[in-house]
Amino acid sequence: MALKLRKLSAPATVRRRKLRVLGTDISLLEAVRNRASTDLGFDIEFEVLDFPSCQRKAALSPETYDVYDQCFHNLSIVWYWGALQPVDTDLLKCWDKVGPLTKLGGVDKYANRGVGDVPVNKLYVQPDHSLGPEATRYIAMLPTVHNFDSFGYDTRIFNGEAKPRESWSMLFAPQAKGRLALVDEPAIGLFDAALAAEAMGVLKFENIGNMTPAELSSLFGFLHAKRQEGAFLRCWSTGHEAAGLFRNGEAAIQSMWSPAYNVLGPATEYVRESAPEEGYRAWHGGLSIARHVFGATLGMAHEYMDWWLSGWAGALMARQGYYIAAAAAPRAYMSSAEWAYWYDGQEALEDLPGVDGHSTVIRKGARRSGGSYLERARRIAVWNTVMDEHNYATRAWTRFVAQVNGKAR
């Protein structure tokens, strides 16, 4: 008897879930995406933009992303536009691990907390949906990566190997004329310039973290005068661009981000990261959730947030000079030598790897500028900030940068 063959249908294709993350190259590294996707069991899509483009898209097109990875000072704009939703800390396993720098405003009672957009002032969602420091169940952004920035300088220009008195005033030192570079971001580079002007005694700000129109006018008057004197080399947009200015010998002193020190090549021998006596310009990144997210995607967003503070990502960030809000978590993923150098500020007992885990970025015997995490965190002068006069500052800054970089207005 002949058997009747039945045609089998093709097996159903199960489509993996996907979480869309919008941010910058500060933390959206391919290694992070790959590891998080493997650990969490769903696809993760990164969209990496520069600071202004990222902020603009986050505010105006929240439907294009699920999680926003940026800095606390951005909340002045993105939260204001209603693009984000409150994050329920009761649904985050990691919340209890977050340290006092963001929850309370400082690492301890001895800390100089700085002025400007101090993260705690924008952390908690208040009953009227505004942001403030009074603790509630809901937050606008989960604190993650942060650092305390300064400037880098060519020691050959500043007394060779003898360490000078490090001050923001060095930016406009006569021997660096024509070789000064600033980061092109009004919420960042503007404050490097302001700290320098105040350290020189040229200007005095009532609150450097929230300058008045008159103070901004004076600051830009100072900057344009320095531009006409030939003080500036250029304004840069990426850390790799900044590193290149040191590698090719163009810059003598400039705004710098920690990862850039790891790619200086031979210039590592003479470029030094400063620990200015006036204090650091600090910044703090974090994760927010777009307003449209709900259901399974909201659950993935919470899982992704918890993953960020579970340890592995914090260890990776440490290898490019950044700290993580759950400071103890990365220790299990770092060697004792790495922890001693990056967090305790001790001498490197061996060559230390970068984010790829192989190439050496810190040589044996080196010591981190500024000391331990606590020592650095206690010396904050100002935070990256979106001031009340941000629109005025941004317009004036854009004109200034265009003139420095030789572009049409």
For the regions a language model picked out, list residue spans one by one.
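Glycine-centered hinge/linker elements that transmit conformational signals in sensory
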Residues: 189, 193-194, 205-238
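Short loop->beta-strand "edge-of-pocket" segments that line small-molecule binding or catalytic clefts
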Residues: 169-188
